C-alpha cells in the first residue's frame, strides 16, 4: 500500500512546471510504481490556452476547481468544464483548453507517464519508458 501527501512532493522532481508556463503538475503515481496508470494533480493557469494531443496516451480528467472551455480540434465542438465535470480522451483527440479561472484537475494516464514528460511542439507527450 502507498499513502502519500501532496506536500511531500513540493520542491521535488514530481512537481513539474511546463516549459510553456501554462501549467504545473504534481505527479502522484508514476510508471515506476508499476500499477499500469499514472495520476496527477494539475493546475492550468487562468488566461492561458494550451493545445494538446495525447497521441501515445489515453487521459481521463476530472475538474475539481476552476473554469475552462475545452475544444475538440477535430470536430470544433466546445464544452464548458467546471468542478464535477469529467472528460475522457479515449480517441487521442487533439484538443485545446482555454482557462478562464485557474483550473485544478486530477488526471489519469494510460500508459503511465514517467514524470519527465512535457508537451512537444504538437502538444504530444512522448512515450517515455522508466529508466533502469
UniProtKB/Swiss-Prot annotation:
Its EC number is 4.2.1.108. It is an enzyme of class 4 (lyase). Keywords: Lyase. InterPro entries: Ectoine_synth, RmlC-like_jellyroll, RmlC_Cupin_sf. GO terms for biological process: ectoine biosynthetic process. It comes from the Bacteria. GO terms for molecular function: ectoine synthase activity. It holds the Pfam family Ectoine_synth. SUPFAM superfamilies: RmlC-like cupins. Gene3D superfamilies: Jelly Rolls (2.60.120.10). It catalyses: (2S)-4-acetamido-2-aminobutanoate = L-ectoine + H2O. Pathway: Amine and polyamine biosynthesis; ectoine biosynthesis; L-ectoine from L-aspartate 4-semialdehyde: step 3/3. Coiled coil: none annotated. Catalyzes the circularization of gamma-N-acetyl-alpha,gamma-diaminobutyric acid (ADABA) to ectoine (1,4,5,6-tetrahydro-2-methyl-4-pyrimidine carboxylic acid), which is an excellent osmoprotectant. Belongs to the ectoine synthase family. NCBIfam families: PRK13290.1. PANTHER family: L-ECTOINE SYNTHASE, PTHR39289. This is L-ectoine synthase.
